[in-house]
Amino acid sequence: MSEKMYPIPFASLMNWVVTEYAQSGDIFGVHKKYEATGKSLPIFGERIETPFGPAAGPNSQLAQNIIAAYFAGARFFEVKTVQKMDGADLAACVPRPCILAADEGYNQEWSTELTVPQAQDEYIKAWCALKVISKVYGLGDPDGFVFNMSVGYDLEGIKGRKVNSYIDNMMDASRTAQFKECKKVLTELFPAERDFIAHISPRVSRSVTVSTLHGCPPQEIERIASYLLTKKHLHTFVKCNPTILGYKTARSILDSMGYDYIVFDEHHFNEDLQWEDAVPMFERLQKLADKEGLEFGLKLSNTFPVDTTRGELPNDEMYMSGRSLFPLTIEMCNRISRAFGGKMRISFAGGAEYFNCDKLFAAGIWPITVATTILKPGGYNRLLQMVEKVEPMEYRAFAGTDSAAISDLAASARTNYHHLKPIKPLPSRKSTEQVPWLDCFIAPCKGGCPIEQDVPEYLELCRKGLYGPALKLITEKNALPFITGTICAHRCQGKCSRNFYEESVHIRDTKLLAAQKGYNALMASIKLPERVEGKRVAIIGGGPTGIAAAYFCGRAGIETTIFERERKLGGVPRYVIPAFRISDEAIDKDIALMMSYGVEVKCGKSAPSVAELKEMGYTHILLATGAWKAGKLDIEGNVQGVIEWMKKEKKQVKPNLSGNIVVVGAGNTAMDAARVAKRMGAHATILYRRTKKFMPADEHELQLAIDEGVEFIELAAPVKQAKGMLLCDKMVLGEPDETGRRSPVKSGEQFSIPCDLVLSAVGEQVDSDLMAANGIEMERKGPAFETNVEGVYCAGDAHRGPATVVEGIADAARFAEAVIGVPYEYEIPAQAFITESDAIAKHGILKMSGKCEGERCLQCSTVCENCVDSCPNRANVAVVMPDESHQIIHVDKMCNECGNCTQFCPYASEPCHDKFTLFQTAEDMVESKNPGVLFLDGDHVRVRMAEERDYDLTTSDNDLPVDIEALIFTIRDKYSYLFA
């Protein structure tokens, strides 16, 4: 495809609006409709029904973007900046991709990529469309919204013919061809509104926001604002850069909030507008505005320039936005409000979103414009929730800002969960698969789970209070619901799409809830299966993997015996993991579930040899011995393996430790050991070669250790323990490896810390003696983990090395399938599914809690549409097929390859390049490599799949795949407005 987007003619645009609204009640894919209540706020001699709208940027560049935002509740539109450089010249300066909004936002955009006349036409089209749909569809007062121009970047350019004409035409569009065309088209579409349409005001905008480049001298800023106030008589905002805070303040704030990896130097801070120049200039401009009878204020803030250091975007510098910008912007507001005694009007942009918008409004900061939040899943739909949060508050004319409230908000922002960077970066939510052309909706949580639990389905059952069926569904694939509901590494939660909203659904907790509430019913329903003849299974090792394997085999009716050398089953969870993390009762319930299928258990002595087991008639033998052997830490001194130490300490009832214990390593086991040492009376320290960000422990476990007072020493490696001290090498982080982890390198410096005992938690190992004694060669494992000895298998730690519980269950299931000979099949109850409309209703709603976590589940496998929501231009469209399924098509003409949809697609793909594409012209198709369709006429199409061919839709033997043909027919018959 080409990065060149082009505007939709107004007649086609309105045909889309009218047809889609009639068919579905949506407009440009936005599902959440705001209907104004009659309240409004005065501004610029006009009124706005809500204080929200899109900031000058990707969401206010095209007419459809503005209409989509209005439909969801926006009423203040800061349309995208225009300047003397435009069109192809400007687009050539913008790299692709240019937007990265997966977490805090970054972009390399600039002003509009259209020509200035095209941009003007887009804004006039949007203005006229909103005037009519507000009335016809009952969305609000046709005079209840405001368009605010954004112009830059120097006075010469602003006074030049191109931008000057734009300003004049936005102030009075009556003489423009576009305004006349809009009124003509609208009159044809809505003849009953002829008189109303005839009187649509041509005064599209009576206000402006001044945007200047970094390094613009204060004198130039003042000249621009003065010109717009006195010569154009426009209400004026001046946009300020966060650099006005000073380098030390910005660096300190970001570092303290976990954004220490964001790189920037002092040059912008030194070259941009300085505080001592800004305050007197703003005072002069305020007086000038008062003299002219106009409103003046500051737009806080512009995006923040930072270095591109990790290949985030193509150019060397990018502009930061979103949640990391909020603490900087609100600190700017704090200083401005105090400096001007609350009298300076502030228009906000810089990380505003649902969780802070009410506080901003209550402090007198409005209008509030947004960008990053509506570039995320939910997209424009997120605006409605913001509006509904603020609407019950008192609407009153601007009378000043509340300096005390802003100061409190600035202080709290630095510790607020929604603005802090997590200790550890979230893993990628993408799979390794390519997005299919059709039927692409998947639940990333399920794909991220080693056993592919039916997560959305059991969450929905729990939401409905059907805990018995929920647990039954869980145990179709998961033999250990209590253990995994308590200590699972929950990779599913790292993949959860809810992370793009606030935080993941608490999947593990809900699994435990289902286990607790559904256990009795499940146990009562279990019946001994009919015994399978000719197969007997022996499992050596009664830890999680062994229990799971026995469960799966026993459920299939295969005679199964577990051999465990300890007195009880349970392995590491029972004998090593501390009781404050998992109780014996929870472990026992999973064991009872397994034993309900008639599994025999032999505990308290070592298992017979493989040869002996075969002589006893066992046809399949599984080695499921855990990783009990200490990892090697090759230093002198008092060093113990963490597993044996924790096993010993678990037997202690009362605190029995003192002195200084240093745990070397940073996995979950290391966190457990440090917490045990701390609770048992010692001073506990975790020593790690890298930083917290790269620790392998789950963030939750890491945070618990921090909360309990465990000391962390980062960038350090042990050298020698002696005489109560541990000598350490000071490390530095080198270049990232292929996983993104930066390799630790010795700095040449050393230091010592108090230490009486070192615990080695650096990669536990499987005892290879058992393998060797039975002639098993570990490197020769075949399908389903069969070893070089026929009929003998390895699973869990014995197969992978130290493995998580759920990885052990996955191995156990594969082993059981090899024994049984056929895949296990089961049915998901109908109550576990929800409708497409119910799934869509969850989009755009930020929600930290609910009666049940199932309320927060987005049901991605029913309807994903992340690419639809996140596209500012609406270039990814969901079409409803005759069977009511939703399919995604990409509309080439509306896309500028910003790349935003790529961030949120759960596949290793780019929807703008990889989804089936609708082309507008033959030239567009030639310039693209996308798969897709071009309508040549009503019955003939050109389709590109593996190859490009023309097809006749009137013939039944046209060789088009049936599903692709159905999609093409649906586009032609129901969505012709997409290419009209």
Question: At which residue positions do the language-model features occur?
Answer:
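Glycine-rich phosphate-binding active-site loops on the catalytic face of alpha/beta enzymes
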Residues: 75-85, 242, 359-386
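Rossmann-like dinucleotide/flavin-binding elements
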Residues: 540-561, 602-611, 625-633, 645-699, ...
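Feature captures the FAD/FMN-dependent oxidoreductase FAD-binding
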Residues: 531, 536-538, 588-635, 720-726, ...
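Catalytic cores of alpha/beta
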Residues: 64-68, 352-368
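Ferredoxin-type iron-sulfur electron-transfer modules and their immediate structural context
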Residues: 317, 323, 374-375, 381, ...
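N-terminal capping/small domains of soluble enzymes
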Residues: 1-226, 231
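Rossmann-like dinucleotide-binding cores of NAD(P)H-dependent redox enzymes
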Residues: 559-562, 566-601, 674-719
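Glycine/Thr-rich beta-alpha phosphate-binding loop at enzyme active sites
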Residues: 22-37, 242, 246-342, 377-395
